[in-house]
């Protein structure tokens, strides 16, 4: 006699999951809530879904007058965002090949990233993953080496995050990375958990040696705040014609704990390009203005001759004359 197997309907399974979720949330157990939302993030199909989960989790965990933005950001990046994936890339050393094109390795194989433009929001398979998901905040470094987060993307207004008197940072999980040469190639790998030879990002540790669950990098190039101090935020007038030493002096006026961006920022930027695009650099992938110099060769034999530019060539460039 054949055995009859009754399979639960999808609606029944969803109801059971909802009941379990409600039970965990009602318990108020922070560790259990973080594990629950960690599993939901790993199952998310898009970065928009992760954004919604973040807001949901934040509203559950936030207790006015008790919790702080620093605390919840530390929990989200340090505990909720977690996976066992290893993201990697390898590029040929110059002696192996002069090509800037590499290849994805490990769990990065098959993932696609195409830069978005003003006209189109293109594909980024990495954006929703725990090691790459990013969050804008408004924050300040404190004189004692700590920092304070004043506003958080998706929770506070974008004006408070990007245009306030504070600095606009972008947070990302403080992962473990390893880089080495082998067999004519340069390898770079990143993961959530410690492993032999892997190190966390320097910008995830403050001067007191405290390691955070997130790293912080500036979202914008430096500009002047309304009070005349140097800052980092949307809508600031840019700082031009300023030397490195002058820039350090401008940051010192904001506070002795500031000195401006370091080489760590460039290292992180290049690492993200390598991991997402499997290329040695941004050329041909993410570019702004690529041509500033317009030169026109002419043959001249005169000296002391004055020349004028015609209407066909608007003077948007510095005209220089070279004698060949």
Which functions belong to the PLM regions below?
Residues 324:
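Active-site-proximal beta-strands of protease catalytic cores
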Residues 8, 13, 20, 34, ...:
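Short, intrinsically disordered low-complexity segments
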Residues 56-68:
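Acidic, serine/threonine- and proline/glycine-rich low-complexity repeats
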Residues 1-48:
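Short, low-complexity N-terminal tether/leader segments at secretion or assembly junctions of large
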Residues 65-67, 73-176, 180-234, 314-315:
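Short acidic-hydrophobic catalytic motif
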Residues 159, 163-166, 198-321:
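Short aromatic-cysteine micro-motif
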């Amino acid at each position: 006699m054949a055995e009859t197997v009754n399979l639960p309907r999808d609606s029944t399974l969803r109801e059971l999951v909802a009941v379990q979720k409600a039970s965990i949330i009602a318990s108020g157990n922070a560790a259990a809530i973080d594990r629950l939302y960690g599993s939901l993030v790993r199952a998310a199909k898009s970065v928009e879904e992760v954004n919604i989960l973040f807001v949901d989790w934040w509203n559950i965990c936030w207790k006015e007058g008790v919790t702080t933005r620093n605390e919840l950001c530390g929990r989200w990046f340090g505990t909720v965002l977690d996976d066992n994936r290893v993201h990697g890339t390898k590029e040929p050393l110059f002696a192996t090949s002069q090509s800037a094109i590499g290849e994805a390795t490990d769990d990065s194989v098959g993932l696609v990233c195409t830069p978005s433009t003003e006209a189109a929001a293109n594909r980024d398979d990495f954006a929703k993953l725990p090691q790459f998901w990013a969050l804008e905040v408004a924050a300040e470094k404190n004189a004692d080496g700590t920092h304070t987060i004043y506003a958080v993307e998706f929770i506070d207004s974008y004006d408070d995050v990007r245009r306030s008197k504070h600095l606009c940072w972008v947070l990302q999980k403080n992962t473990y990375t390893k880089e080495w040469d082998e067999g004519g190639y340069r390898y770079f790998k990143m993961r959530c958990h410690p492993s032999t030879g892997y190190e966390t990002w320097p910008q995830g540790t403050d001067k007191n040696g405290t390691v955070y669950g997130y790293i912080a990098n500036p979202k914008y190039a430096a500009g002047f705040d309304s009070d005349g101090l140097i800052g980092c935020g949307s809508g600031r007038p840019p700082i031009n014609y300023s030397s490195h030493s002058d820039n350090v002096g401008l940051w010192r006026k904001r506070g002795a704990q500031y000195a401006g961006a370091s080489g760590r920022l460039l290292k992180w930027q290049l690492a993200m390009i390598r991991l997402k695009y499997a290329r040695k650099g941004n050329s041909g992938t993410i570019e702004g203005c690529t041509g500033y110099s317009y030169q026109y060769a002419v043959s001249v034999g005169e000296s002391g001759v004055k020349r004028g530019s015609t209407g066909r060539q608007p003077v948007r460039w510095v005209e220089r004359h070279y004698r060949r």
